Amino acid sequence: MTSTSQQFLAALTEYPDGALGPRELCVSCVKVLPVDRAALTIGGASTTWEPLSATDETAARIEAHQVVTGEGPAVDAAERGGPVLVDDLSLEFDRWPGFTTALGRDAYGAMFAFPLQIGAIAIGVLDLYRNEPVPIEPDELTAMLAVADIVTMVLMSRPPLADVDANAADSWWTPSPSSSEIHQATGMVVAQLSAPPRVAYLRLRAHAFAQDRPLTEVAREVIERRLRFDPDDDPLPELAN
């Protein structure tokens, strides 16, 4: 076990029984790694995405932009099954035009995305951020990979610590109110379009992207029957891939 892994495990033991959750995992990442913020998003290349937690509002906004645009380091990391390392987000417009445009003033610094997976089982992505556009060093990459492995094990309800309640992890998967709204709205759009859930989700996301609005707001309009999708309307091409 690397020294960084030991430091990370030690940071997790600082939390009392039952208090170790997604936010604590993110905060512990910042404590032991050379990064300024961290965030967790649950989902995969063929599923919907849900931000799970973040250390601050900036990280939370960036995660939300990835969910809405379907672009960004986390999306690519999930699709490739390997880390995506970005030294400077401000230079990545050609790579992720929708994502970087949506970022606006947040398009700065470095971002490193690590898929959370064990074998063929993938559950999400750990995103790590630096305020400055500083390239990652080999030893830093090794440390981040080690921490991502531990985060994966904890999120998969296999806590590596003897004093962590194994049942506590189960409650992390309870959808937040906003996530529940997105799921409910997706189901309603499935009925409206007579389409698979992923297509319905893409239509929701495309509408949010086109209007530069949070996905949760669009979902709420669908639930309240103030917005209905027409099968004859095509989603934005860049979001339909």
Task: Name each model feature, range by range.
Residues 110-117:
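Short hydrophobic beta-strand micro-motif common in sensory/regulatory domains
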Residues 160-241:
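Signal-transducing coiled-coil/dimerization helices and immediately adjacent hinge/linker segments
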Residues 43, 59-95, 101-109:
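Regulatory sensory and allosteric helical modules in signal-transduction proteins
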Residues 1-68, 220-241:
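Intrinsically disordered, low-complexity terminal regulatory regions
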Residues 141-152:
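Allosteric cytosolic regulatory segments
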Residues 4, 152-160, 177:
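Signal-transducing alpha-helical linker
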Residues 125-134, 139:
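Short beta-strand-to-loop transition segments that serve as allosteric relay/switch motifs
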